[in-house]
UniProtKB/Swiss-Prot annotation:
Protein name as annotated: Methylthioribose-1-phosphate isomerase
This protein's UniProt keywords: Amino-acid biosynthesis, Isomerase, Methionine biosynthesis
Molecular-function GO terms, alphabetical: S-methyl-5-thioribose-1-phosphate isomerase activity
Organism: Sulfurihydrogenibium sp. (strain YO3AOP1)
Classification of source organism: Bacteria, Pseudomonadati, Aquificota, Aquificia, Aquificales
Binding site for substrate: 50-52, 84, 186, 237-238
Gene: mtnA
């Protein structure tokens, strides 16, 4: 078994949260200090931190910080909710923090304990996802992944990338193909950085070359993350995931989604109900301060798309695997009744 380094994207020191500024990677490793509610809002909105599980964890610490500042708890809750609209983990974590406040009042110790609990639970969930998921990876495999679903997107280890990490840890002979993931380049900037640190063989590819690699027989498995999963098994994830799922189905390649159960939204029937974040067009027209398009042109910049359950081979959670997901299977898996 290989020994891997673990990356922690956040650290609490003297009641202040420090986070890796993911906009600076891969060339600089910079830690940002979050001391006020406004700091937390900016960190999430501006994608200094990103990844659905990590946003939830940072949101929980942000709730604690806002209460510590003396801001009304409903205002804290609403301000943090408005930072990113698609990832359900943020709302799930804020609901937990709000519930503690409404039950016990302004008890900062209990609020901080709950935020820490959310962080620890996520880390253990990721390790469990890795354990379930790596069983699905052949002993020798070329794996395609999209965006960043590793330690940088979570409390540590990762979801889809955690499965890849677990497979490599268990001595499997894998090569990872990393979609660059325009326009924020989370694949080429963040996933490649994590894989390089671990010594996991990988190639960065342009998003548009994925289908060609599948046609050439160069991809055995696709593993992606999720920002929100609805009752029927539809998945909201980084823009480009839907296209990959169609290509995978056409080429008969297993398409796995890895996510903690906190990414399940039992209030939504299907992906049609998920609000899709549309970000500033300048993110498409400019790439890290370089202008790459006529500035007078307009650009569309949807951050997420919806992959239908029909295109998904299985959803891998910390509780186990849901094959060919649908509403009945998801409710049964989580011990809920059909309404």
């Amino acid at each position: 078994m290989r020994k891997l380094k673990d990356i922690k994207p956040l650290e609490l020191k003297d009641d202040v949260l420090y986070v890796i500024n993911q906009l600076k990677l891969p060339h600089e490793l910079v830690w940002e200090k979050l001391e006020t509610l406004a700091d937390y809002e900016k960190a999430i909105k501006d994608m200094i931190v990103r990844g659905a599980p990590l946003i939830g964890i940072v949101g929980a610490y942000g709730f604690y910080t806002g209460i510590k500042e003396g801001i009304d708890y409903i205002q804290v809750y609403e301000r943090l909710k408005q930072t990113r609209p698609t990832a359900v983990n943020l709302f799930w974590a804020l609901d937990r923090m709000k519930s503690i406040y409404e039950k016990y009042g302004n008890d900062l110790n209990l609020l901080l304990k709950e935020a820490k609990r959310i962080e620890v639970e996520d880390y253990h969930a990721n390790r469990s996802i890795g354990g379930y998921g790596e069983v699905l990876i052949p002993k020798k495999a070329n794996i395609l992944t999209h965006c960043n679903t590793g330690a940088l997107a979570t409390a540590g280890w990762g979801t889809a990338l955690g499965i890849i990490r677990s497979a490599f840890e268990n001595d499997k002979d894998i090569t990872v193909y990393v979609d660059e993931t325009r326009p924020y380049l989370q694949g080429s900037r963040l996933t490649a950085w994590e894989l390089l640190r671990e010594g996991i063989p990988h190639y960065i590819i342009t998003d548009s070359s994925a289908g060609f690699l599948m046609k050439k027989g160069m991809i055995d498995v696709i593993v992606v993350g999720a920002d929100r999963i609805t009752l029927n098994g539809d998945v909201a994830n980084k823009i480009g995931t839907y296209s990959l799922s169609i290509l995978a189905k056409h080429h008969n390649i297993p398409f796995y989604v890895a996510a903690p159960s906190s990414s399940l939204d039992f209030n939504l029937e299907s992906g049609d109900e998920i609000p899709i974040e549309e970000r500033n067009e300048d993110e498409v027209k400019n790439c890290h301060c370089c202008k790459v398009a006529p500035q007078q042109s307009h650009a569309l910049n949807y951050s997420f798309d919806i992959t239908p359950a029909d295109n998904i081979t299985a959803i891998i959670t910390e509780k186990g695997i849901i094959e060919k997901p649908n509403k009945e299977k998801i409710l049964k898996f989580f011990g809920r009744k059909l309404s």
